[in-house]
């Protein structure tokens, strides 16, 4: 009995990044292919390789259960004549964006796909309301011909060049079109190499497709070019056709999709063959054997690579340090770096010494001790993670210097890096934690026990972002710098709106139905949660939502199917990737809708193939500061002869600005300072009015407190409790007394929490508390588990940690009063939202 091996031309929702096209998700497509008894499936989205990591990971996931099933990765490109662009396109002369399918046989084939896709996207342009991504014939010739045998090509659907020749023959009966089609086939066979070009038949009752299929069979016999049968799947099952139609029509109601996509779904052998009454059993067997031959020729290669920090150009450091032994003795870890075989490690030694010599506030034993701690953690993490973190630091040091050179101011510090003195030493941040009152911990930035990529938030002026990126490309290379892409998805609300549009409901009706979706802290509930509730998070079903969806079963059906689908391409808020080799050695590049160059992979997939991002965040308040400085210079209020960095440091540098000015703090209280960082919202304005901060530490605390929620509905809000304890410190004393704390136990908490008036309002605070011997003596790894359970709002994990916390208390005979107060009052407050404190140290 014959068995259709599987379709080598299929789409997933990654095909939606330019135009709504497909409702298949990767797991569903692969699972259904297996369910149908197929042996292979190829994923060939419309001019994008963005699914490749996720496809590989899902193929790995099913490998144990289905070891013989093969997943092939490819790309459906738009093949055009050479030099086609928006200005010279002429459909009357046959110009169009002809579909053509490419399959990668191995890792070299993948690299060729990366180069082809990148060329198409970088030359792309907007025409007829969508971005066009043309691949020229010369691209195929330049990339494939010198190194044949790594890519397989097939002629694609009716939108392909070869089928179009046949359709012209069908419409005119002019044999010249058939002759041109034959010559085109010979050209492609020679270009790809023997056995690497295939003719593609597709199932359809459409007379045009049937004619093309028959012509392909004849050409195959005449030229000896093999043929295959594919389904060009845009949805999974025949029963999904209506949902697919509604999804496509939600974007353009005039699209004729019913007939065009009538048979573009996954099929069983029996259903597939029913579309081909004109094929003999032998012809089916030939097509199926050709599919198996392609599957056998395609390797199970991996594009994932271990983390590798690029070696970008670094600053030049003085290697002739006269008193180097002094520094090696003060910071013994430097000796390991100096002797290391990792090339960046010795350079870091000289960079650190250079930084100490430039920073007077680092020339003391406390600073040497703090730097030694950072260096030791860096060394351990580099060894454990096999990552050259020294290169990361040196890269970032120069990148920030180039940002200044490009004409933007750079923010002093934000994120967990504020607690890492080494970053201050290297001028990556401008804040020395040793000079601040709020306790900041280096392990929040780099925890040797945690395998994760380092991340420093660098704030720049959004107004200067374009020129900054242009400057960075000039310094590091046009093909070495890229923004990080993001992919928009259909969230629950947008899924309802999209479904309503596709079903041609009145706009106000769709808006009403979408408005019924609830959210918590900015996160929309899923459709499933709205309809069925979520027992784990104690969220009941919404009776109103259920009632309305039952009134609109068609909306409910369509919305469920499209929720979660990728529906567009975007740009990461700050992520920029730097490389020390051409991007196409690792991944492809694309353009966002506004033309910005972005990576072919989103952030997490980039990291899986060895690339890491550096965060250059555009911040509105930085724009205003920069404009103010420029105006002050322009009108002669400050010296205009100095560099931007010198001016910034002299006028408003972290340790030059007067932080104690009573007039300034009065302006803060009265909301007369615009764009006060992260205090612009009403919650921040109200919190400042209630508490009257007088220091940056106060602002940092307030910013953390306003993100927390009351533990009980209707209970006292954390900001009200903070204001109360701040004005009446004795009330904190009374609360501790009520929990039975002794004077000594109160002293322990005063030491840690006086800065925040008795509240544990940040992740590092409660992590530090549970590590204290009197409270738990837990290690950093356990406290990080606690952080994750709170940050990810995981009740199950938190419940397990609660058991471990109290069991540890009993085993170590710790104070039940102190431990209970810490767990039930201080830590519990963070369960609404555990924020880290450094964002507001800016």
Could you tell me what each predicted segment is?
Residues 1-842:
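Alpha-helical scaffold/interaction cores of sigma-54-like transcription cofactors
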């Amino acid at each position: 009995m014959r068995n259709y091996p599987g379709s080598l031309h299929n789409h997933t929702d990654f095909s939606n990044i330019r135009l709504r096209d497909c409702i298949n998700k990767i797991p569903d497509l692969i699972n259904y292919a297996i369910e149908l008894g197929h042996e292979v499936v190829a994923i060939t989205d419309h001019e994008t390789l963005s699914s490749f990591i996720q496809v590989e990971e899902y193929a790995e996931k099913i490998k144990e259960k289905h070891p013989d099933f093969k997943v092939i990765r490819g790309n459906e490109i738009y093949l055009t004549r050479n030099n086609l662009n928006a200005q010279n396109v002429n459909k009357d002369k046959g110009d169009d964006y002809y579909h053509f399918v490419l399959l990668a046989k191995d890792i070299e084939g993948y690299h060729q796909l990366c180069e082809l896709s990148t060329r198409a996207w970088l030359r792309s342009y907007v025409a007829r309301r969508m971005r066009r991504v043309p691949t020229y014939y010369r691209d195929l010739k330049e990339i494939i011909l010198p190194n044949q045998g790594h890519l397989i090509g097939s002629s694609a659907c009716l939108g392909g060049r070869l089928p179009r020749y046949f359709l012209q023959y069908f419409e005119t009966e002019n044999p010249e079109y058939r002759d041109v089609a034959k010559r085109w086939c010979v050209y492609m066979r020679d270009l790809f190499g023997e056995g690497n070009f295939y003719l593609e038949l597709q199932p359809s009752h459409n007379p045009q497709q049937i004619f093309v299929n028959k012509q392909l069979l004849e050409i195959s016999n005449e030229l000896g070019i093999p043929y295959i049968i594919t389904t060009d799947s845009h949805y999974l099952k025949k029963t999904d056709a209506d949902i697919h139609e509604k999804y496509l029509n939600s974007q353009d109601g005039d699209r004729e999709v019913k007939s065009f996509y009538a048979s573009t779904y996954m099929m069983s052998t029996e259903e597939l063959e029913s579309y081909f009454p004109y094929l003999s059993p032998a012809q089916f067997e030939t097509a199926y054997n050709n599919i198996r031959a392609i599957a056998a020729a395609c390797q199970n290669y991996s594009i994932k690579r271990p983390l590798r920090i690029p070696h970008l150009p670094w600053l030049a450091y003085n290697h002739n340090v006269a008193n180097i032994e002094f520094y090696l003795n003060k910071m013994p870890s430097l000796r390991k770096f100096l002797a290391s075989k990792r090339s960046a490690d010795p350079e870091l030694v000289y960079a650190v010494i250079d930084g100490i010599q430039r920073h007077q506030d680092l020339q003391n034993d406390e600073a040497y001790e703090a730097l030694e701690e950072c260096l030791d953690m860096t060394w351990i993490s580099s060894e454990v993670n096999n990552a050259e973190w020294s290169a990361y630091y040196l890269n970032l040091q120069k990148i920030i210097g180039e940002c200044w050179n490009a004409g933007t101011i750079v923010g002093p510090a934000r994120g967990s890096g504020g607690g890492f003195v080494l970053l201050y030493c290297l001028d990556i941040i401008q804040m020395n934690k040793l000079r601040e009152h709020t306790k900041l911990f280096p392990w929040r930035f780099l925890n040797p026990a945690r395998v994760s990529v380092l991340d420093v938030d660098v704030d720049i002026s959004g107004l200067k972002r374009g020129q900054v990126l242009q400057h960075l490309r000039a310094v590091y290379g046009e093909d070495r710098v890229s923004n990080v892409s993001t992919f928009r998805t259909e969230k629950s609300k947008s899924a309802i709106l999209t479904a309503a549009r596709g079903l041609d409901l009145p706009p106000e009706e769709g808006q009403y139905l979408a408005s019924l979706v609830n959210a918590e802290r900015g996160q929309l509930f899923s459709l499933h949660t709205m309809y069925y509730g979520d027992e784990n998070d104690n969220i009941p079903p919404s009776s109103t939502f259920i009632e309305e969806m039952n009134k609109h079963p068609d909306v409910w059906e369509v919305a469920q199917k499209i929720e979660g689908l990728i529906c567009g391409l975007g740009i990461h808020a700050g992520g920029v990737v730097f490389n020390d080799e051409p991007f196409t050695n690792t991944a492809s590049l694309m353009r966002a809708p506004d033309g910005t160059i972005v990576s072919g992979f989103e952030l997490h997939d980039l990291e899986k193939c060895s690339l890491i991002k550096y965060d250059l965040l555009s911040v509105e308040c930085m724009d205003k500061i920069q404009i103010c400085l420029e105006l002050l210079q322009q009108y002669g209020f400050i010296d205009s002869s100095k560099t931007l960095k010198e001016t910034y440091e002299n006028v408003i540098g972290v340790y030059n600005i007067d932080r104690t000015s009573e007039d300034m703090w009065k302006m803060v209280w009265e909301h007369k300072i615009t764009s006060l960082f992260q205090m612009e919202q009403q919650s921040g304005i109200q919190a400042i009015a209630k508490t009257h901060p007088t220091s940056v530490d106060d602002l940092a605390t307030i910013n953390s407190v306003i993100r927390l929620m009351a533990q009980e509905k209707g209970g006292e809000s954390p900001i009200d409790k903070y204001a109360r304890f701040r004005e009446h410190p004795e009330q904190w004393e009374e609360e501790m007394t009520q929990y039975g704390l002794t004077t000594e136990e109160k002293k322990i908490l005063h030491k840690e929490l006086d800065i925040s008036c008795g509240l544990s309002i940040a992740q590092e605070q409660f992590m530090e508390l549970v590590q204290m011997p009197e409270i738990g003596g837990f290690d950093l790894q356990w406290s990080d588990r606690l952080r994750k359970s709170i940050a990810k709002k995981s009740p199950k994990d938190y419940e397990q940690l609660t058991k471990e916390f109290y069991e540890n208390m009993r085993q170590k005979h710790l104070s039940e009063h102190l431990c209970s107060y810490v767990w039930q009052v201080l830590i519990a407050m963070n369960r609404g939202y555990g924020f880290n404190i450094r964002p507001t140290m800016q």
